[in-house]
Amino acid sequence: MLIFPLLNDLSRKIIHIDMDAFFAAVEIRDNPKLRGKPVIIGSDPRQTGGRGVVSTCSYEARAFGVHSAMSSKEAYERCPQAVFISGNYEKYKSVGLQIRAIFKRYTDLIEPMSIDEAYLDVTENKLGIKSAVKIARLIQKDIWQELHLTASAGVSYNKFLAKMASDYQKPHGLTVILPEQAEDFLKQMDISKFHGVGKKTVERLHQMGVFTGADLLEVPEVTLIDRFGRLGYDLYRKARGIHNSPVKSNRIRKSIGKEKTYGKILLAEEDIKKELTLLSEKVALNLHQQEKAGKIVILKIRYEDFSTLTKRKSLAQKTQDASQISQIALQLYEELSKKERGVRLLGITMTGF
């Protein structure tokens, strides 16, 4: 039995563009000697005492299991021959603006998700081109010819499916999901690949025996809403290719944060501080990717007895600097009166954009 009606707008033409290994690709483009080598954008752990996180990496590095947001130390252990580059975010921002300018030739309905990916609604576009697939190919061609970079594209009738499509064939892929193909495409997909379904939700779905889109299709809406609340409503519709959220050209993020729940309680102050530093670096990475800087740092800490505290500090000037965010987060931690208790969750959020 359906709790809410299924409304599915099949008339829209949505493209999701995702640049391939963007920061690393820009560095390789500007230094051809790096071509074919495992390139990691992030601090070299040999120079930072093991600190730092991976912003992104080339596909050669990914072959060794390196990925975004991994600690630089672990990345080096997996791929000691990698070339580490600290990154030039002003350069990446400049290239990102050039990419945005290419998008605007076709439509003003652009929703940037970060510096290197965006949704485009081309249902009504500036050039009067009826085929969204043709527009996606033209955008890929423009980006390659003008910037010597590759992008993957997904085309469908909503944002969820367009994102799933762009992830399907990387790098430099183009995947189209038509309305009549959506359900079969999603049926064979591992549930962990569903966009917007986080690791904890995946674990809970696995406990319910849900491992694929086909499994998710079999779960009644009432069960999903009972288990997951509002997310259950969305899961039921995503399994059926339904997602009617519009492309928002004025989308504003009010905060950017990272938190982590620890399977093993953190007891040592040294371990807690190390985790806070790592979380700060991940938040800084997200700030760079979103082209944001904030004035307020918020620390969240949940103890082993599940009691939760938050502390915040306002800065004189906006920042996206990892070391400054880390310094403030550690200062907030030092001000806590219950440092002797075990910690099960840490979180750092930046706001005040």
Curated annotation (Swiss-Prot):
Cofactor comment in the record? Binds 2 magnesium ions per subunit.
Choose any GO biological process term that the UniProt entry carries and state it. SOS response
Q: Where in the cell is it found?
A: Cytoplasm
Q: What is its EC number?
A: 2.7.7.7
Task: Write out the catalysed reaction.
Answer: DNA(n) + a 2'-deoxyribonucleoside 5'-triphosphate = DNA(n+1) + diphosphate
Q: Which cofactor does it need?
A: Mg(2+)
Name the SUPFAM superfamilies on file: DNA/RNA polymerases, Lesion bypass DNA polymerase (Y-family), little finger domain
Q: Does the keyword DNA repair apply?
A: yes
Instruction: Kindly list the positions annotated as binding Mg(2+).
Output: 18, 116
Keyword Nucleotidyltransferase part of the UniProt annotation: yes
Q: Which GO terms describe its molecular function?
A: damaged DNA binding; DNA-directed DNA polymerase activity; magnesium ion binding
* Pfam families in alphabetical order: IMS, IMS_C, IMS_HHH
Catalytic residues per the record? Answer: 117
Instruction: Describe the subunit structure.
Output: Monomer.
Record's family?
Belongs to the DNA polymerase type-Y family.
What this protein is called in its record is DNA polymerase IV
Organism for this UniProt entry: Streptococcus pneumoniae serotype 4 (strain ATCC BAA-334 / TIGR4)
